[in-house]
């Protein structure tokens, strides 16, 4: 599905931009703890952006589970990385409670990708 290739490329691009912003724009302006949180958000956004690219390439199959995996991983990026970015910029600690939702969405997305692979290979 071309949409996942686009979403993956956009997220990878944004991860590069947010990583550069963290390294150059936030350095010395926030604590080391929050800088580490920012870096974690950037890293996970990049990994899962690449996952979306892969899903986009393999989603030419008829397996609906591959598409579900893509949407779950995309939602995971929004909840996980998005909540961490906002947490760092606002330092509203309650936003940290949203982050695990993104982590769970990532995990379910990866499980759906595994299931789709077994169904396609089987």
Swiss-Prot record:
It comes from the Bacteria. InterPro entries: DUF423. It is found in: Cell membrane. It is a multi-pass membrane protein. Signal peptide: none annotated. Its main location: membrane. Belongs to the UPF0382 family. This is UPF0382 membrane protein SAOUHSC_00567. The lineage of its organism: Bacteria, Bacillati, Bacillota, Bacilli, Bacillales.
């Amino acid at each position: 599905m071309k949409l996942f290739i686009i979403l993956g490329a956009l997220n990878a691009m944004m991860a590069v931009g947010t990583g550069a912003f963290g390294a150059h724009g936030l350095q010395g302006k926030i604590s080391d703890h929050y800088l580490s949180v920012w870096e974690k958000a950037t890293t996970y956004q990049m990994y899962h952006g690449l996952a979306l690219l892969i899903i986009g390439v393999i989603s030419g199959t008829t397996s609906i589970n591959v598409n579900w995996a893509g949407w779950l991983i995309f939602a995971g990026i929004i909840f996980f990385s998005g909540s961490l970015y906002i947490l760092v910029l606002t330092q509203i600690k309650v936003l940290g409670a949203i982050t695990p939702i993104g982590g769970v969405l990532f995990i379910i997305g990866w499980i759906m990708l595994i299931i789709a692979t077994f169904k396609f290979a089987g």
